[in-house]
């Protein structure tokens, strides 16, 4: 889900007929999971035999029967269709919103001053940073668990997660308002007057709500709901900017109004999630508290891991807002938006991988063999095109963006290949139930990336920030690559059923 300003990243899958996802249970607070191994929660614990083992002479051992080749081919085809159905909806949503978002930014950069675009980008970066902190892992928890819950519990689980995350972001945004006079010139806009302050708070909370909605749609395999919400938001934003131009309100607060208002209106798509009404008594406060306790630990594990990998984007945007003047920030924000739009398809491959693997290690191996080469190939092609065509792309936004943004765009796209490796590493560790280990590794990597971007920005400005980030991310990817290649090359052993029965004799 992209940002609300110019700086913006049980059943069958909708449209497919693959086998249903295995149901997954989520542990309570007392559950324990051995690092490095799949627990019964994540992968399903092997059930014991239904009857007592027979005495050896009474049970002739038959050779293991190999599954029929046609059945195996049909199962593999269903896996592939399900994976790329989820991926297809993600691409459609991002493609539609990207085209409309770029159109919006092209209009804004031509009709609004670079300073106003930069100030709106600073507010946007701050809002998305608050959303990253206030999410508490709830959006990713909904991706992983919502589809496997009983139908009657889905609405109350979704709404409880929405309330908690939005309330957290509301508190954080109010705190940011109080501190904004001390956060640099680009961020002082959010407390310039009461109207702008209200728009900032509403936009921050609505950004969190939209992120929660989109992830719930992925978890429920309601890709069309995510597609419609994102498209409606982007189309309305473009229309509101047109109205602002007609009435002469070409200011940074006007851009904030367009983004906040359209995010709120896009929630009319909530019925498209097709959530059943909550049974009487299931939506009361005590039941919601019980849900929060049940899923709290797992959600926070997702949150720590998500912060350790995705917080880099928000922190880099915040670093730019603190170190770069508003005009330069507009050029950086535009280059970053173009880069994130171009690189979203490789990222969505990894997200589809996480949504479909369901803790099945053999399925994980097969899907990684599909998504990793495709992601790297797409990313490599995008880098080549961007290095050559960067000035032509930025010309859409005006001559100033070509002059001052081309180098930034060429450096930023070099981050893309590293993130294909990072995103696959995270999806693999989640499937293996090794959230704690992955969080530590990714936290260290995030510190390296942030340090590279900050040092580059301090000493060499916008160009140094982009170059420092690209170098640090590439070094991190080199460290993570062996773990990804192990899953890519090695299929986990599967113990034949007949061997299991013989061992019980």
Predicted segments with their positions:
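Hydrophobic alpha-helical transmembrane segments
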Residues: 194-201, 227-278, 446-448, 462-487
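Membrane-interface junctions at transmembrane-helix termini in multi-pass inner-membrane proteins
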Residues: 206-229, 359, 414-441
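Interfacial segments at transmembrane-helix termini and the short loops linking adjacent helices
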Residues: 76, 180-200, 326, 388-420
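Membrane-water interface segments that mark the loop-to-transmembrane alpha-helix transition
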Residues: 85-98, 123, 128, 132-181, ...
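Transmembrane helical elements of multi-pass membrane transporters/channels
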Residues: 85-105, 226, 230-233, 237, ...
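Interhelical loop/hinge segments that connect adjacent transmembrane helices in multipass membrane
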Residues: 59, 65-83, 192, 224-228, ...
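Helix-loop junctions and terminal segments of transmembrane helices
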Residues: 134-151, 278, 339-363, 430-431
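Signature of the first transmembrane helix
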Residues: 53-61, 65, 79-139, 300-326, ...
């Amino acid at each position: 889900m992209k940002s609300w300003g110019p700086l913006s990243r049980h059943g069958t899958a909708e449209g497919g007929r693959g086998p249903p996802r295995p149901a997954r249970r989520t542990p309570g607070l007392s559950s324990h999971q051995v690092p490095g191994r799949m627990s019964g929660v994540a992968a399903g614990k092997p059930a014991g035999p239904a009857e007592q083992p027979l005495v050896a002479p009474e049970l002739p051992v038959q050779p293991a029967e190999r599954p029929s080749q046609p059945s195996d081919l049909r199962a593999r085809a269903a896996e592939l269709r399900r994976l790329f159905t989820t991926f297809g909806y993600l691409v459609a949503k991002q493609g539609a919103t990207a085209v409309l978002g770029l159109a919006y930014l092209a209009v804004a950069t031509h009709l609004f001053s670079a300073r106003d675009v930069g100030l709106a980008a600073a507010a946007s970066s701050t809002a998305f940073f608050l959303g990253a902190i206030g999410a508490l892992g709830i959006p990713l928890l909904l991706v992983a668990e919502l589809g496997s819950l009983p139908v009657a519990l889905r609405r109350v689980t979704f709404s409880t997660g929405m309330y908690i995350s939005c309330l957290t972001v509301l508190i954080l945004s109010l705190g940011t308002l109080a501190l904004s006079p001390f956060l640099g010139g680009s961020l002082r806009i959010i407390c310039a007057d009461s109207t702008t302050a209200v728009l900032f708070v509403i936009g921050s909370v609505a950004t969190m709500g939209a992120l929660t909605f989109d992830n719930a749609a992925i978890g429920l395999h309601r890709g069309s709901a995510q597609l419609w919400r994102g498209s409606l938001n982007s189309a309305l934003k473009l229309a509101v900017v047109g109205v602002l131009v007609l009435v002469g309100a070409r200011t940074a607060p006007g851009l904030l109004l367009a983004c906040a208002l359209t995010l709120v209106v896009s929630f009319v798509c909530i019925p498209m999630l097709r959530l059943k009404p909550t049974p009487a008594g299931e939506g009361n406060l005590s039941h919601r508290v019980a849900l929060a306790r049940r899923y709290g630990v797992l959600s926070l594990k997702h949150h720590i891991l998500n912060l350790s990998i995705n917080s880099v984007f928000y922190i880099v945007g915040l670093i730019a807002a603190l170190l770069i003047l508003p005009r330069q920030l507009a050029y950086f924000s535009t280059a970053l938006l173009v880069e994130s739009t171009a690189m979203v398809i490789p990222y969505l491959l990894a997200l589809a991988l996480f949504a479909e693997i369901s803790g099945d290690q053999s399925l994980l191996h097969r899907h990684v063999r599909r998504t990793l080469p495709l992601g790297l190939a797409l990313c490599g092609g995008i880098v080549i095109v961007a290095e050559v065509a960067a000035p032509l792309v930025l010309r859409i936004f005006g001559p100033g963006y070509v002059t001052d943004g081309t180098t930034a765009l060429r450096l930023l796209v070099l981050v893309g290949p590293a993130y294909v490796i990072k995103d696959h590493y995270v999806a693999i560790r989640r499937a293996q139930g090794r959230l704690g280990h992955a969080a530590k590794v990714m936290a260290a990597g995030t510190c390296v990336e942030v340090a590279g971007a900050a040092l580059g920005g301090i000493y060499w400005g916008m160009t140094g920030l982009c170059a420092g980030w690209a170098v640090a991310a590439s070094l991190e990817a080199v460290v993570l690559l062996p773990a990804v290649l192990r899953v890519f090359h090695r299929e986990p052993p599967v113990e034949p059923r007949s061997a299991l029965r013989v061992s019980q004799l």
